[in-house]
Amino acid sequence: MAADRAATLFMERNMTDKERLPRHVAVIMDGNGRWAQKNKVSRLAGHNAGMLAMKEIIKRADVLGIKYLTVYAFSTENWKRSQEEVGGIFGLLVKYVASELKELNENNVKVAVLGDLKKIPRSAQASIDKALSTTGENDGLHFNIALNYGSRQEIARAARRLAGRVLSGEMDLCEIDEAAVSRDLYTGEENGFIPDPDLIIRTSGEERISNFLLWQAAYSELTFTDSLWPYFTPDEFEQIICDYAQRERRFGGR
């Protein structure tokens, strides 16, 4: 009830119709390393600061009544980083689940993971499994973590699955359409059909998508902010949501 009241106050304050709020917001959390360099601390300390920023954005998204929040936590390309940094990132994930899962569950948040989890450390897999099983029946904010995720890999995986069904006779070649491809993406049937993102935010001043939700982002609105991720505040997030609500989305129609 408190979250509903806060969302109402937000809409009244910004003269925003609830129907104009994004249903699904995706975030490319960029800038942890540069934040660490700027503050003369380790890259792992930067990732920890980024984790703290993420916690606050989750809370604000829930308060504003956003139904889906997806964060780009670890890409398939991030394995190129040092073993120490990669291990530290997954260690932070385990720490985050251990410290925050109880509160997430109490707030009716449902956790989902998008990506190939076979390669990640066992301790991280165990933490993820616990988060999924604990929050699986919740129906509040859907918090999706893109982990060992790459959109090209995701699309190729969907293509292999569809080809396998055609070869086995389960479906005809002419049945492969946009809906069929979408069904076999990580955002498809296996995760309850997460809707395409209405808004994608990238921090740190970089203006690119970086292999993130390429299929799903066909008609997404894009916002790029100069703030390094650990500096990205709930108030800035809220302002971006307000700015989005003033946009006129055309979906290629005119």
Where are the language model's segments positioned?
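Flexible, compositionally biased loop and terminal segments
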Residues: 2-254
